[in-house]
Design a protein with these regions (language model features):
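Non-catalytic substrate-recognition/targeting regions of SAM-dependent transferases
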Residues: 105-118, 134-196
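Short, surface-exposed beta-strand-loop junctions and turns on beta-sheet-rich folds
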Residues: 49, 58, 132-134, 192-193
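Short clusters of small/polar residues that mark proteolytic maturation junctions
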Residues: 45, 55, 129, 188-189
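Short amphipathic alpha-helical segments
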Residues: 74-81, 132-140
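Non-catalytic accessory regions of SAM-dependent methyltransferases
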Residues: 1-121, 171-174
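A short interface-forming secondary-structure element
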Residues: 121-134
């Protein structure tokens, strides 16, 4: 597995030892030239030891950590992370007979920094807040419909996309959801944030 490497400045490993999912640009001493925003990189200590894998960005938050272990960031990775999030929501009885709208992915809390995914019945709304997640949109959308049985369509509502578009499936721009037995009309194409 050969990926570009970014190197931490001496002494900056401590923060990552506490599993903080962000690496700020000031913590890096060396970045391989010509890295694209959103590219998957390995993070190494100043001694050359592997620490993490993440999405690189030429912004203040230079790396958003995806994994603390050496592994491929591929379809099985996205399925695994989404499956873990789905399993956690299932323990909270989501979805249920009185609620079919919930947040499936809440960024760093679900070990997917820079990503929000809300489920509204059979539609999932994808919202990337980091270039790496936007670059991975199609793979993530495909993994969503594979791991969340009720979802048949995924729409992209990321801030950095020109217009909302369907990543998987298609549908109307709005629908009715249930939250604690109450019905709400949600417009996931023009509504605020992800629609609700």
């Amino acid at each position: 597995m050969s990926r570009p490497v970014v190197t931490l400045a001496k002494g900056k490993e401590r923060t990552l030892g506490r599993r903080h999912p962000w690496i700020f640009s000031g913590a890096l001493t060396r970045v391989e030239a010509e890295l694209l925003d959103g590219e998957v990189v390995d993070v190494h200590t100043s001694r050359g030891e592997f620490v993490a894998i993440g999405h690189y960005n030429r912004a203040s938050i230079a790396v958003r950590v995806l994994s603390w272990q050496q592994r491929a960031i591929d379809h099985s990775f996205w399925r695994e992370r989404l499956g873990e999030a789905r399993a956690l929501r299932t323990t909270l009885a989501l979805p249920g007979t009185e609620t079919n709208a919930y947040r499936l992915i809440c960024g760093e809390g679900d070990q997917l920094p820079g990503l929000i995914v809300d489920v509204y019945g059979s539609v999932a709304v994808f919202q990337a807040h980091a270039p790496g997640m936007l670059r991975s949109a199609q793979a993530i959308a495909e993994a969503i419909v594979e791991t969340v049985p009720e979802v048949t369509a995924v729409i992209d509502r990321s801030k950095d996309t020109e217009s909302a578009g369907w990543l998987v499936g298609s549908g109307e721009g709005e629908g009715v959801i249930l939250e604690h037995g109450h019905s709400f009309r949600v417009n996931w194409q023009r509504g605020q944030k992800t629609g609700f």
